[in-house]
Amino acid sequence: MQFKDILYEVKDDYANIAINRPKVLNAFTPVTLQELKAALEVAEKDKEVGIIVLSGAGDRAFCSGGDMNWESSKEFQDHEYEFHIHLTKCSKPII
């Protein structure tokens, strides 16, 4: 699966999902949120994955939060809500 805003990699028994927008301190957009949700779904279905690790690319920030250019949009809020629901219902540990 190809992603634009995140990196997805499986190593040993864990999946690393990294927000890959270091120029904006990994601030997320609706696309980022959609991709994060999709990557969580892939990791959750993968029998080889026991743990999911969320991280941020670069060395300045894990994630600065929502991209201010999108944060007030209904689309952003809907995707953020769906992602948070998926985080809480995921059957695998998330670090």
Give residue spans per PLM region.
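Glycine- (often His-adjacent) and acidic-residue-rich active-site loop
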Residues: E48, G56-C90
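A short, small-residue-rich loop immediately preceding and capping a beta-strand
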Residues: K92-I95
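Conserved CoA-thioester-binding segment of acyl-CoA-metabolizing enzymes
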Residues: M1-S55
